[in-house]
Amino acid sequence: MGATVGVYFCHCGGIITEKIDPEVVRAAVLRLPEVAYFTPISLLCSEDGLGELTRDILARAPERVVIAACSPREHERTFKRALAGTTVNPYLMQMVNIREQVAWVVDDPAAAAEKAVAGIRSAVRRVARNLPLRNIEIETHEETLVIGAGPAGMQAALTLAVAGRPVVLVEKAPMIGGLPVRYEAVAPNMECGPCMLEPMMDQLLHGDAARHIELLTMAEVTAVKGFLGNFEVTIRQAPRFVDASACIGCSMCADACPARAPHPYNCGFDTRPAIAMPFLGALPNLPYLDPATCLRTTGEDCRLCEQACPVPGTIRLDDREKVIERTVGSVIVATGAGLYDCGVFPQLGHGRVPGVYSSLEFERLSSPSGPTAGQIVAPGDKAPERVAIVHCVGSLDAAHQDYCSGVCCQVAFKFNHLVRHRCPEAHITHFHRELTMPGKEAGRLLAHNLEDERNTFVRYERLDDLRISDAPGARRVEIMGGATVRGGEFDLVLLCPAMTPGADTKAIGAMLDVATDRWGFFEELHTRMSPTSSKVAGIHLAGTCHGPKDIPQSIADGLAASASILASITPGKKMELEPIRASVLEGRCSGCRVCLSVCPYRAISFDEAAQSASISQVICQGCGTCVAACPSGVIAGAHFTSEQIYAEIGGILA
């Protein structure tokens, strides 16, 4: 190879040349056989500097370029864009960091110049082996699949729809809104949950952007295949047995239905007809029929609901499951979370001792749309005079959930508010490990509860020390430990469990090939820098599916995930991806599958017929993990080949 490399030395406005003499560097660099010329420029990243760079390259026509300047993290993309307007392929340029790694850390000018020359020599040897790569262009679909219609999913869908993007919003329940629409109040300001979310739900169902949203309730995503910009999605939608376009929401079908079953949205405290609204105020305002409860399932030819309906043809007893297929460019997972099973702690009496309720059970018992129409009653239908609220059920416990959910204490104090509002004379005891009230507004809620003279706070060390037993006409709560036993008798005991991964998180993760963390939540690409991105390109996370959080944080997640999609996919425009990707050398794979287990982006698949691995050039992020792991050495990393790296090392050591 002749002298075909042009070297550009940035003064960085004097910051670099204060320590490194460019003339000393010039003399040494021009002795390298590959270097055609050496050009210093005062401030290469400035508009004038970039103009001088492009003009000089067009005039001198080098085959390759080395730029000695600042960190590639700061301006490599700047210089690549500049080279795109010249005769030099942007990937035939190599940067050398002589500012952060030399001028800022080496005090002796002679040593600094020597180190700068070594870096440039290394880059010259490497760039001689670079290949003229081209960016990968892919067709993309602008549609987005949003899985889950809780606060995060609804916000994500609305943000995209307002921008004119089509959205497929899939919700497995017959209504939207997630858990908060079943809450009487939302901490810390005690807003009505359904009232707070109603404007968002109304906009999603009936607003100007609703035409861009295909809402599929009672539906589940069963398969997702493909990659960023091109996901093939299969959705199964259970029959509602009600024509949504004709139903007027009068509930006359429910009044006529003779069948009854435990109410799934009231925690089984009461019953509901086979056909009914999920609960009062649920949206969409549509009933649904549960085939497992309907008398027709047992062979009876019951048509009372159909006969009672004032709009003929609205009840569709012949409705069947639908299989729906869509192609989307991105996916947002907003499937929500669950609550730790209080039954795991037999000593707490949940499900065994009357009057001991989990937080979700009490949410329904205190809701006007719940089984008691919002009246708070203890066993025996009496108003409670003494109430125990147990914090941290399953939280901060290495044997269960070792984290703090950050919202349970607010829930506990919300319950305090509800009880105090409806039973003003009740005495309330909080059994707690820690009191965690993050955020700007939650502190006022804590202070209000601490100031209440009818509230008592008792700290316990371990949940195993608590015992809840059935005393005559009451529930006895005791803290066992040491020589003393503390506690008392209560009419109601409310358990506030940890927030946990949703029951279907593992199955959805396997379907999407999205990893879960050690707690079972979906794992982010980076918990701080990319908190709503999964490790699979094009699949985003929002809300409590990737960790405990409150409603404002969930809505912020929905906004962030949708904004990321709006920024990455432009309708009618191909997506450009850097070509720095790994690939398997054809015909040389041994079929060991080591690469599949180490790829953090799930970019590698295995062809059973060919007994060979292959790497998706769209999903791969060029991290090089598989290149290093391949025992046969048959995976090559574009722009970071072994030959290039060895040449770079050799240049340093020469």
PLM region spans:
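Residues forming the flavin
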Residues: 1-654
